[in-house]
Amino acid sequence: MASVEQPNKPKLKLYSYFRSSCSFRVRIALNLKGLDYEYVPVNLLKGEQFTPEFLKINPIGYVPALVDGEDVISDSFAILMYLEEKYPEHPILPADIHKKAINYQAANIVSSSIQPLQNLAVLNFIGEKVSPDEKVPWVQRHISKGFAALEKLLQGHAGRFATGDEVYLADLFLEPQIHAAITRFNVDMTQFPLLLRLHEAYSQLPEFQNAMPDKQPDSTSPTAS
């Protein structure tokens, strides 16, 4: 992968789990910006996020976390904003304030109203409260509600990508969520033609494809699934 020169600096380290959509967002950004990084797998199913070593990096025990020299940043949105300011090559935010606002809104719908309801802790909790036949439909309903809002938000703004013909922040949040909806939760995407079209556009971009869960080194681990 082509990389931006970082003289006299150690390589970036990304603590990631292959299936984590939050980590997926950051992997896309690193690829878009051409930043070389070391992938450090954290197996969530084995509880490695709660080890003393990882909790020193991120006390809340979530992935992703990024180490850049002496800087340690956790939370995908914080990481993306850090990367945008420190490594401005291939900006992930548009200059236009109105378009920027749409990007923030789309990212927030995903990160606040959809993704938290499908994370591992929530799925385990829901699995204790409902039958196995009810768990996936519960997740599908919440994803579909968020997707319906995104379809309305992006109407009139989308071009080749979510907010025009360049890849921006909204796209980094959308593709991991769409991918999870299709591959993990069997959401019927024909209800959301705009999002489905965007998903197909992302499939043509190597920066997105190289960030896919099945392309990560920990996806082949016997305990990964």
Swiss-Prot record:
The enzyme's E.C. designation: 2.5.1.18
Coiled-coil segments: none
Chief place of localization: cytoplasm
Domain called GST C-terminal: residue spans: 96-221
Binding site for glutathione: 20-25, 49, 63, 75-76, 115, 119-121
Gene Ontology annotations of biological process type: glutathione metabolic process; L-phenylalanine catabolic process
Residues spanning the membrane: none
Domain called GST N-terminal: residue spans: 10-91
Protein name, UniProt field: Glutathione S-transferase zeta class
